[in-house]
C-alpha cells in the first residue's frame, strides 16, 4: 500500500513539474530588446512616401542606450538633416512597462537640449502582441497634444516596434501614412554621441 501511494505521489509531482509556465510575449519582447543594451546599429528608411523625402538615402543609427527592468531608451540619429546639415540627434524612443502592458513615448529635443513643443507623445499596448512585435495606439494625452498644436491628423496614429533575430523596425501608420525605418542587427556600429539634452 505504501509503495502504491509513493508511486502515485511521484506521478503527481512529475505531472506538476512538466507543466510549463505561461509565457508572456511582452516580457519576451522587452528581454529581446534589453539583450542589445549598449549596442548601436546602422539602418535606413524602409518606407517610400513623399513626406519622408528628406530622410531618403540618409545614414541612420539606433542606439539601445539605457536599460532598466522597466525602461529602455533608444535614441534615433539621422545624418544630413540636423540644423547644421549634420546629424539630427533630436529623437529618443522610450519603452516602459506599465501595470497593463508596455508604453512607447517619443522624447524630442532641440539642439540646445530644450524640449520640443511636440514631445512625450505615444501610446500603450492594447493587447499582448507577440515576442517580436508590439503595437502602440495613440493615447488620450497625445491626442490632446496633437489637437492643441494643430496636428490632429496624428490623432489616429498607431506605432509599432519589431525586433527579430536580424533586425529592429520602428513604424508609424494611420490612414494615408506609412513610415518605417529598419536597422540591421548584423551591422553594429560605434555608439553615437548622446542625443540632444541627455
Model-derived segments and spans:
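Tryptophan-anchored aromatic micro-motifs
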Residues: 25-51
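Short, solvent-exposed loop/hinge segments that bridge or flank secondary-structure elements
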Residues: 42-69
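Hydrophobic/aromatic beta-strand elements that line small-molecule binding cavities or substrate pockets
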Residues: 59-65, 91-96, 121-123, 156-161, ...
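Mid-chain, structured segments of secreted extracytoplasmic proteins
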Residues: 65-106
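An exposed acidic His-Trp-rich patch
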Residues: 93-145
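Edge beta-strand at a domain terminus
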Residues: 119-124, 165-198
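Helix-rich interaction surfaces within compact, conserved domain-sized segments
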Residues: 133-175
Amino acid at each position: 500500500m505504501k509503495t502504491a501511494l509513493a508511486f502515485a505521489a511521484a506521478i503527481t509531482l512529475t505531472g506538476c513539474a512538466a507543466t510549463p509556465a505561461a509565457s508572456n510575449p511582452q516580457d519576451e519582447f522587452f528581454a529581446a530588446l534589453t539583450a542589445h543594451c549598449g549596442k548601436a546599429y546602422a539602418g535606413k528608411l524602409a518606407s517610400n512616401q513623399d513626406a519622408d523625402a528628406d530622410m531618403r538615402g540618409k545614414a541612420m543609427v539606433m542606439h539601445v542606450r539605457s536599460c532598466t527592468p522597466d525602461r529602455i531608451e533608444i535614441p534615433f540619429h539621422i545624418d544630413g538633416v540636423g540644423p547644421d546639415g549634420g546629424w539630427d540627434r533630436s529623437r529618443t524612443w522610450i519603452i516602459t512597462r506599465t501595470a497593463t502592458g508596455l508604453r512607447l513615448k517619443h522624447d524630442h529635443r532641440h539642439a540646445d537640449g530644450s524640449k520640443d513643443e511636440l514631445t512625450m507623445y505615444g501610446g500603450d499596448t492594447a493587447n499582448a502582441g507577440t515576442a517580436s512585435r508590439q503595437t502602440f495606439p495613440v493615447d488620450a494625452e497625445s491626442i490632446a497634444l496633437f489637437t492643441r498644436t494643430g496636428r490632429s491628423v496624428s490623432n489616429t496614429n498607431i506605432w509599432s516596434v519589431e525586433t527579430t533575430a536580424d533586425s529592429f523596425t520602428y513604424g508609424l501608420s494611420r490612414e494615408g501614412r506609412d513610415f518605417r525605418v529598419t536597422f540591421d542587427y548584423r551591422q553594429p556600429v560605434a555608439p553615437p554621441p548622446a542625443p540632444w539634452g541627455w
